[in-house]
C-alpha cells in the first residue's frame, strides 16, 4: 500500500527541467542547486536524477559529504562556504569547492596546513548586501587569496542577485555592471545567474548558471508558472480522503468554528496537516485537487488533517487521492493563495511525508 501523505518525485520532470535550462543557457555549465534536501525533493534522489549536471551547489558541508558518500563524483560547491578551520581538511579529502565571502575564512585559509590547495570561488557583494566582499575590499582580498598557498589557482568569481525574480527591476543590471567591472580580465570561472537570472537575464549567464527552484519545475517569479517556460513540476504532494461527511447549512467545522457552511454540502477530510509541513495559515479557498477538480479548504488546517468542501453533489469516496500541489495544481498557485512562495512550501515538508521516486 502506498504511504500517505507522500511526495512523489518525477525523475523525468527533473531531467526535462535540466534540459530546458541547458537550452536557455547553452554556453554555460550548470551547477544544480540541491541544498535544503534537494529543495525538499530528496538530496541524493535529485543528484542521481540530475547526474548529467556539471556540478552541484549546496549550503552545508554535511550535504556535500552525503553526496560524496552516495557516489556523486561531480564538482560540489559550498555556497555559504566553510564555517570552521576543521572543515578545510574535509574539503581537501573530498574534493569540495568553497565560496569565500568573509575575512574570517581568509584567515583560516592562511593559517591552515593542508595537503593540497582548496578551490575557491570568491563571492562579490555586488548589491545584495548579505554575503560577499564589497567592491572596495575586492582588490585587497583577491590579492591575499592569490598569495595564499592553500588556495588553488585560478580563483573563481561569483555574485548573487537580489531582484532577478523581478524582471522589470533594473537593479539586476546594476549588479551585473558592478561585478563585471570589478572582475574584468581576471582568470577563472564566473557565475552570476540563479534560476531567475538564467530564465530572465541572459546576459548574466556566464560560465556557470546556478539554478535551484527552476530545476524542480517552479518559476522563481511571483505570478508566473514553470509551465510557461517548459518546466514540469517534479513533486506531486499526495494524500487521501479519510472521511466524507454530509454537512448542514449553518454548521461550523474545525478548531475555533472558523468556517460555517452557507448551504448543505459534503465535506472531505484529507490526511495532511501542519505536522506534515502543510501551512496552518492556509486560508479558506486554498485549492486542493480531488478527482479532476479544485475544491477549497474550509476551516483551519490542523496538525494531521485539513477539510475541503467537496460540494453538495459530490460522489467522492473515502480513500480517493487528494493532490495538495503538483502537475495538476501548480505549487505556485497554492503559494499565492497562502501568501508565501513555492520555495517555502516544498522545503518545509516534515519527515512524516514519505519522499519517493515516481
UniProtKB/Swiss-Prot annotation:
One BP term from GO: D-alanine biosynthetic process
Any one GO molecular function term: pyridoxal phosphate binding
Enzyme class, UniProt record, top EC level: isomerase
Active-site residue list: 35 (proton acceptor), 255 (proton acceptor)
Record bears the keyword Cell inner membrane: no
CDD domains per the UniProt record, alphabetical: PLPDE_III_AR_proteobact
Cofactors required: pyridoxal 5'-phosphate
Catalytic activity reported: L-alanine = D-alanine
Modified residues annotated as N6-(pyridoxal phosphate)lysine in this record: 35
EC number: 5.1.1.1
Pathway per the UniProt entry: Amino-acid biosynthesis; D-alanine biosynthesis; D-alanine from L-alanine: step 1/1
UniProt similarity note: Belongs to the alanine racemase family.
Record PANTHER family: ALANINE RACEMASE, ALANINE RACEMASE, BIOSYNTHETIC
Biological role: Catalyzes the interconversion of L-alanine and D-alanine. May also act on other amino acids.
Protein name, per record: Alanine racemase
Species whose genome carries this gene: Shewanella sp. (strain ANA-3)
